[in-house]
A protein has these predicted regions:
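Structured loop/turn residues at beta-strand edges in well-structured enzyme cores
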Residues: 26, 68, 131-132, 169, ...
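N-terminal pre-Walker A segment at the start of P-loop NTPase domains
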Residues: 1-19
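Conserved alpha/beta core segments of nucleic-acid transaction machinery
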Residues: 248-288
Length: 288
């Protein structure tokens, strides 16, 4: 379709259809994190937020404007593990939210099925299966192709194929991906360049979010206690993760937000405060 420049100049532009703030329908986005950080839990809870038209289903606080059908293709975990996650999340949902999510969310385990989106037959089945979806989650990217992850040419082809799915379904495609060993070692997993493999994976995506573990320094600077402001500390920092956006093409980048890991691994938003030293009660500035 050729853009009508006269209409574009003279008429009000269309309202962009965001899946959640900054993530545009019909585009490809990424969520990156080290292994065992909580990205699959965050993505599953986000999928439920988009699938549920009731406010009670938005556990991660995305505040989506529109909701709809969501397809979650889980390539890393067996069915039993997925059931445990759903059960843990369900404890924080009311009955109405659970019923709407059951109607609109399809959670499909694909571990061991050797799905390959670069195979034309597999690709056609994916498009047919996801035809009326608003969001498609691919967990994780490495489970759905056989290309060279370090080749910019191969990864550009892969993202282009995901864009083909997005174009044919109208859905946003969110793929989950791991970060490189170097970025994890240097605590730089919140950077746009942190993703493992070729730069085209993120350069060609239109949105990229991250989930990062709380660092030791952050645990000394932050408190989850509004009154005495005692630091979270190294012993408890494993219960907190930070979500943020490292790339956003269509809107202003939002502020990072913190989540606390609850029973079963569920992530729930938490408000953190600047910690104070117990001895002098002065505010620590180490996180600035």
């Amino acid at each position: 379709m050729v853009i009508d420049l006269q209409t574009a100049f003279e008429s009000e532009p269309p309202t962009l259809d965001f899946i959640w703030p900054g993530f545009l329908a019909g585009t490809v986005g990424a969520l990156v994190a080290p292994g065992a950080t909580g990205k699959s839990f965050w993505a599953l809870e986000a999928a439920m937020s988009i699938a549920c038209s009731s406010a009670g289903g938005d556990l991660v606080g995305l505040n989506p404007t529109h909701t709809g059908r969501v397809i979650y293709l889980a390539g890393e975990d067996p069915p039993a593990a997925l059931v445990c996650r759903v059960h843990a999340i369900g404890k924080h949902l009311d009955r109405q939210a659970r019923e709407i999510i059951m109607e609109n969310l399809t959670l499909e385990p694909i571990m061991g099925q050797r799905m390959n989106v670069m195979d034309s037959r597999h690709l056609a089945r994916i498009i047919d299966f996801c035809g009326d979806a608003r969001l498609i989650v691919l967990d994780t990217l490495s489970r759905i192709h056989c290309l060279d992850e370090n080749s910019n040419g191969d990864m550009a082809r892969l993202v282009g194929t995901l864009e083909y799915v997005a174009s044919n379904t109208g859905a946003a495609i969110l793929y989950l991906h791991h970060v490189s060993k170097g970025s994890a070692r240097e605590f730089q997993t919140d950077q746009q360049q942190a993703a493992r493999g070729a730069s085209a994976l993120i350069d060609n995506a239109r949105w990229c979010g991250f989930v990062a573990k709380m660092t030791e320094k952050e645990s000394e600077c932050l408190s989850d206690l509004p009154d005495d402001r005692k630091p979270i500390g190294n012993d408890r920092r494993g219960h907190f993760v930070r979500f943020g956006v490292s790339k956003q093409n269509y809107d202003a980048t939002p502020l990072d937000r913190w989540y606390q890991r609850r029973s079963g691994g569920v992530l729930l938003p938490v408000k953190l405060f600047e910690a104070t030293q117990e001895s002098s009660r002065k505010v620590w500035r180490g996180c600035a």
